[in-house]
Regions:
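Histidine-anchored nucleotide/phosphate-binding helix
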Residues: 2-14
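Active-site glycine- and acidic-residue-rich loops that bind
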Residues: 26-28
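Reductase modules of NAD(P)H-dependent flavoproteins
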Residues: 30-208
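Conserved S-adenosyl-L-methionine
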Residues: 13-20, 40-43
């Protein structure tokens, strides 16, 4: 899902004259879609997949990696995927969209494993996937997301439905993970009901 959002952002950035280095991550090879749109959104795409053998790039400057996003970024930076066409140190902005654990890993790695390869004062944001309910902008507080200032330790709160794009260094990812777990039981029950009802629905309405 994150890739579907990012390719529209990438296209807008390229149109504005920016260079875009795009790490597209997937769990399974069958999960990839909108390939042409993603290629149009980036000067360089690194196709990442947990499942071997990974993707075969269509363009000469694109790369492929089997593993997670953080390891892919590191391998790209040190040249294990070939000479970097766009150096990480030239990046002024980093945008992460995906699971809370993936965004947390990227947020942390920027100050550890990836720090030698990043511009010191780059700005990183994540599209925070807090649980949401009313979608009426700051009404029900289901999407309330804690922020922790890394300098002062002060905690503040934002409504993610009002602004999903939040600075990675402020987001309390442990708090986000706990909030997402609140709906775990309902999500599992819903999945069971879908699996139970799907055969009957398919019999009534054959797939075309």
């Amino acid at each position: 899902l994150g890739n579907a959002v990012l390719f529209s952002i990438g296209q807008a950035m390229r149109k504005a004259g920016n260079k875009v280095l795009y790490f597209a991550g997937y769990k399974n090879m069958i999960d990839r879609y909108k390939v042409a749109e993603i290629e149009a959104a980036a000067d360089v795409v690194v196709w990442c997949c947990d499942q071997a053998p990974g993707f075969k790039p269509n363009r000469p400057n694109d790369r492929s990696f089997v593993g997670n996003i953080v390891d892919a970024i590191h391998s790209y930076a040190i040249g294990n995927l070939g000479d970097p066409q766009i150096a990480l140190k030239t990046a002024d902005r980093l945008i992460a969209i995906g699971s809370d654990r993936m965004m947390a890993a990227v947020a942390q790695a920027r100050h550890a494993k990836l720090k030698p390869f990043m511009k010191p004062h780059h700005f990183a944001i994540g599209s925070i996937n807090s649980p949401m309910q009313c979608m009426m902008k700051e009404i029900c507080a289901q999407c309330l997301q804690p922020h922790v200032d890394p300098q002062t330790g002060k905690t503040s709160y934002v409504f993610s439905c009002f602004n999903q794009d939040q600075p990675l260094d402020l987001v309390d990812f442990a708090g986000l993970n706990e909030r997402l777990k609140q709906n775990s039981l309902q999500e599992k029950l819903t999945a069971q009901w879908i699996a139970h009802c799907k055969p009957a629905l398919n019999a009534e309405r054959p797939m075309v």
